[in-house]
Every structure is written in C-alpha cells, then in structure tokens.
Amino acid sequence: DAERYKDSDVKRKELAELSVSMQSTYGKGKYCSPGLAKAMDRIETAEKKKPSRDRSDGCLPLGELSQVLEKSESWDERLEAWKGWRTISVPLRKPYQRFAELGNEGAREIGFRDLGALWRSKYDMTPEAFEADVERLWQEVKPLYDELHCYTRSRLQKRWGKDRIPDGAPIPAHLLGNMWAQQWGGVYPLVEPYPGQPSLDVTRGIQKKKLDARGMVKLGENFFTSLGMPALPQTFWERSLIEKPRDREVVCHASAWDLSYGNDVRIKMCTETTEDDLITIHHELGHNYYFTAYHQLPVLFQDGANDGFHEGIGDTLALSVTPEYLVKVGLLDKAPSNDKAELNVLMRRALDKVAFLPFGKLIDQWRWDVFSGKVGPERYNQAWWELVKTYQGVAPPVARTEAEFDPGAKYHVPANTPYMRYFLAHIYQFQFHRALCKAAGHTGPLHKCSIFGSRAAGDKMWAMLQMGASKPWPDAMEAISG
C-alpha cells in the first residue's frame, strides 16, 4: 500500500507539473511575422491610436493576432493570424495526451469511469442524465442558431465571394472575427440589418469619456452597488491585476479569484478600453460578488449552486447593459428609438449569445470523448474538426492534420477548465434576467430591461448568491426564478 501511495504522489506531482507547463506555454505564446506586425501597426493607425508598443521583433501575442483576425480587410492576413496562433498549441499535443491519461487514473481511483464522468457528476444528477439534458437544451436552441448561421453566411458570401464560401458549405473559421469563431461580434458591420441607424459604438464612448481600465472596473462595481450590494473591499483594488504589465509576460485570459476565506477577491485581466472588455468586467465581477455573498458559509458550501450559475451571474448583469443604461452612464449619446435600430441591437446580442452556444457545447464534447477513449490520440484533430463542423457549421480554412493540435489553441484545454459551465450560463442568464426584470417591475420586451438601480432585483439576486452550494442547484434556481 505504501508503494501505491508513493506512486500516486509521483503521478500527482507529474499532473501538476504538466498543468503548469501547458499553461505557461499557452501564456507565453507568440507568432512571429513581420507582415502581421505591420498589419497591426496599420490597424492602430487607422483607429487613430499611437502604436501601443514597438513591434520591430515582428512577434504578436494572442490579443494582437485576434485584432488582425477581426479587423484586417485582407483574406490572407486573417488566414495567417488564424494559422499562426495554432502553431503555439502544437507542442501541447503530447503533454495533453499524458495529462488526460493521468486525469483518468485519478478519476478511476475515486470511483468514476473517467475524468469526463467525474466532471458530469457535479450537477445533482447522474453523468448520463446530465449529458442527455445538455443535448436536449442544444436541440431546443439549434433552430435559432441555424437561422443566424444561414444569414451570416449569406452576408459573408457578399463580402468574400461564393467561390470561397459556396452555398450550403460550412463557414471558413477565420472569417467570423474571433480566433475560435465562438462569438461573431467582429462581423457585425457586415451583417448589420439596417445600416445608417444611430451608432451603438460603446468603445468610442468609453474612449471619448477617457475612461481608463480602473474607471471601467469602477463602472462595473457601480452597477452592483446600485442593486444594494456592498462595495468591493479595498484589498480588491490593491491586489487585482487590471492592466497588462509592461515588464513581464502574463496569461491575459480574464479571470476572477477568491484567495482566502476572508473575502480576498480579485480579478486578473489585461483590460483594453473596449465594449468587449466592459462586458468582461461585469462577468468577472459577477464571480467576485458571488464569492463575497457566500464567504461566511462553511467551506464546503463556498461555491456556486453549480458552475453554470457562477458563470451566469455576471452575464446576467451584462444583459442589463442596455442602450438606455449606456446613455445614463454617458457612454452613448442616445438610445435607439425605432424598430430598425432595435433590431440592430438584437443582432449584436445574437452574434454574441446565440453564436456561442454550439462552441460552448463542443469543447467538452471533445474532451468527454477523449477521456472515455472514444477518441484516441491519433484522431485528436480530426475528431475536433468533425465536432466543429457538426455543431458550429464551421470548417478550417486550410487542411489540418494530426501534426497539429487545434483544441489546444483554446485556453481552457491546456488549463483543464471544464467548459460546459459556459454553455449552461448562456441558458441560465436569460432565465435569471427574466426573473430579475419581473422583480424590478419591468413591463415590455425583455431586451429593453435594465435592472440597474433596482433594490428589489438586487435583494432577490443576493438571496440566491448567499446560498452558495448549500442547496441543490434546482433550489437556487427556484429562489431566483420561482
């Protein structure tokens, strides 16, 4: 037995080292291309910004490659940015294979069939029932996604030509304005239903108001306090990383942290003064306020009702960042006042929320298949692209082989963070939003509701947050939505 424990210790250490090394490889990832460095300088100049840094080494991190992918007018530059980022995940392929083996061993030691079954066991139902439930939810929202996909493809065909995007074919992955085609806000100018309506350019409003990163976080905090929730602790401002440090490499993927049992909450993100990051701030602060609400519960209950709740809370508040709210806080001149302008707002939301759903499901679908042995290491990439095509209707713009490891180009894979929470959060947040709008006394279309300033909505939300994980998640859902 002593031998077995020793062996387990060795493997635990190996697992931890693999995890750190994969995340480090991802965090330091850069792709070097003098052509793309020039493209990035050109994009910043076009946006009337001074180049944010010297790019004479020609190397670009993920954030800059993503900007080229979204903003360049050149098919080839977008393609190179897309391919370039996927060079950083190639070295992760072998470590990930070993990581999956060790993760499965650990799961089996505590009585689960594999690591995927362990992940699926955390939802107050059997792993099999959970998998079936997720598939049912996807089938319910799929018709809406299919319509959005069809409309978006037709607009992309107009821009890039039917020879490159034939009728009925999947959309090439580098054309949707996002490195993983997970949200499509980057193609909004191409798909805007009614051009010429008053601008909803919140990024411009942020920059016009000269809001810096800290000011944006203050604005997010102000939303929560308007609901009657406490201000963030002073330690939050002293210990958070809100801007990208100039003197060292960090993982820029935004995250929220709860670092003690004494309400030491923080965020870590490389904030840019953009609308996207304003929404991300609301999302991350949602985690922080959840941490704060349950920090006095016994340690075992210091968690969300399930991980989808944790991801959904900040997103629920972000649904209240309506044009009317943005006018109130001085980031928009005026709210849309006719049906056409309103449809533009809804299209923006669909590109963000509806477009995400299949991606939210497929990442864990791929990992469940890897952990269960249904997909062996010799088919990692092929199986990934089969799922992307099936769920998203998206295809790689160039042929991919098993020499690559494209799943590893998404942070949550090397970081071993389960992803189903984001799929669930995209469903839950609309249920939460509807319930809180009702509590706030809102009547009329839901997309026009902002709970900003409503103590009644805040009390309802806070009561649910304070439950933490002390009750099964259906009880927490009932507490907020009835």
What name fits each language-model region?
Residues 203-261:
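Auxiliary, metal-adjacent structural segments of Zn-dependent hydrolase domains
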Residues 285-300, 317-324:
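Catalytic Zn2+-binding segment of zinc metalloproteases
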Residues 130, 134-144, 304-341, 345:
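Post-HExxH zinc-binding segment in Zn-dependent metallohydrolases
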Residues 1-204, 435-436, 444, 450-458, ...:
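A well-structured
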Residues 237-242, 261-263, 280, 284-294, ...:
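Alpha-helical recognition segments enriched in aromatics with Gly/Pro capping
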Residues 119-131, 267-271, 294-306:
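Short helix/strand-bridging catalytic loops that position acidic/His residues to coordinate divalent metals
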Residues 114-117, 127, 182, 186-201, ...:
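C-terminal, non-catalytic "cap/extension" segments appended to globular domains
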Residues 207-212, 262-282:
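Short pre-active-site segment immediately N-terminal to the catalytic Zn-binding motif
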